[in-house]
Curated annotation (Swiss-Prot):
This is Cell division protein FtsZ. One of its GO terms (molecular function) is GTPase activity. NCBIfam families: ftsZ. GO terms for biological process: FtsZ-dependent cytokinesis; protein polymerization.
Length: 395
């Protein structure tokens, strides 16, 4: 038995990959038919940036050459929208705002979106997954994001909303706007990623304000990119879209993690530890009920390394958790390994303590975090399956 284990530990995925490539290069009579079916099965993903912050996020994704997703920017500010590089842009509220923005009034942002609802419905149709991203607290993003999420939901799309909450220095009015917008957005989101900008300051404590905002854009973009790559990157072991769909709709608090090894050392464990490390908010992954993770590695990744990562994840989460995993070979990675993780059912004290302390008049936030049950009563602080949305805490 030991001899077999020793042998397997030396087997490179490269050997499997070469054989797989040889088979893939074949020209069987059924290949054309399979290819035609495959093209119809591709997951259609759109990322819609709402307002200035959301538009900046899709601009960053454009600069980073995100693949397998259409990028769209929507804003009331014609000048800012003009500076965004993405191909698809929509200026909303030409009658309401005349292209000059909303004056930080979410109601005006909402009216501007409703004014262009026909165009918005065309954008979100025939889409499997719609990302709605915005910096909450201002007028356009806060007001129009829920309108867009609702249109996408009604069109049959899974809706993943990825937003930031304001820095404390931006004042109480923007926080008031943000939490009201968050509550509206939650009603039409299958998954809601809420990133408190104040927590980002621990990452860039002495940065200028513009640098802090740019870092917030990066965190949003990295979060979206990780989910897109989990869904779309094909490989030796693929993650089925239907599994992802089930997890996204399964309810509960969730965590998204991403990690990449550096040169030398135990690369698979380095990447995994980085993916599981909570940089913004402390979470307990031992309660996770679903875990989706993808390893993206060079061809020399070994069976032993993959098994080691699997064993480590099993140690950290609930033994009854469902684990869905995939492996993609990327020759451009040289010797590095990337790990992407998505877990649902994790828990965090942040949900009831830190959010409320960040917002002195915390009734709105408390109601969002706890949700309400079918009878309209305030639910317990831990989010359960009957709550109307998922809150994702990002690492």
């Amino acid at each position: 038995m030991g001899d077999i284990t020793d042998l397997l530990s030396k087997v490179s995925i490269d050997d499997v990959y070469d054989e797989w490539e040889d088979q893939a290069s074949g020209s069987l009579p059924e290949d054309a038919e399979i290819e035609n079916v495959y093209k119809t099965l591709n997951v259609k993903i759109k990322v819609i940036g709402c307002g200035g912050g959301g538009s900046n996020t899709v601009n960053r994704l454009y600069d980073d050459a995100l693949k397998n997703a259409d990028l769209i920017a929507i804003n009331t500010d014609a000048s800012h929208l003009r500076s965004i590089k993405v191909k698809h842009k929509l200026l909303i509220g030409q009658k309401t705002t005349k292209g000059l923005g909303t004056g930080a009034d979410p109601k005006v942002g909402e009216e501007a979106a409703i004014e262009e609802i026909v165009a918005i419905k065309k954008i979100v149709q025939n889409t499997d997954i719609t990302f709605v991203t915005a910096g909450l607290g201002g007028g356009t993003g806060t007001g129009c994001a829920p309108v867009i999420a609702r249109a996408a939901k009604e069109a049959g799309s899974i809706v993943i909303s990825v937003v930031t909450l304001p820095f404390e220095s931006e004042g109480p009015l923007r926080m008031d706007n943000a939490v009201i917008g968050l509550e509206k957005l939650a009603q039409f989101s299958d998954t809601l990623v809420a990133i408190p900008n104040q927590k980002l300051l621990s990452e860039v404590p002495n940065a200028e304000m513009k640098v802090a905002f740019a870092y917030a854009d990066k965190v949003l973009a990295d979060t979206i990119r990780s989910i897109v790559e989990i869904i779309t990157k094909t490989g030796i072991i693929n993650i089925d879209y239907s599994d992802i769909k089930t997890v996204m709709q399964s309810g509960g608090v969730a965590l998204i993690g991403m990690g990449q090894s550096k040169k030398g050392g135990d690369r698979i464990m380095t990447a995994l530890e980085e993916a599981l490390k909570p940089r913004l908010i402390d979470v307990d992954v031992s309660t996770a009920k679903d875990c989706v993770f993808k390893i993206i590695a060079p061809p020399d990744i070994t069976v032993s390394e993959v098994g080691k990562a699997m064993d480590e994840i099993k140690k950290k989460i609930n033994p009854r958790s469902r684990i869905i995993w995939g492996l993609t070979i990327d020759k451009d990675l040289d010797k590095d390994v990337k790990v992407l993780i998505f877990m649902t059912g994790v828990s965090s004290a942040y949900l009831v303590k830190d959010v409320e302390s960040a917002r002195k008049a915390g009734e709105h936030v408390h109601r969002i975090i706890c949700g309400r049950d079918r009878h309209g009563e305030l639910d317990q602080p831990m989010i359960r399956e009957n709550i109307f949305f998922n809150l994702i805490i990002t690492t």
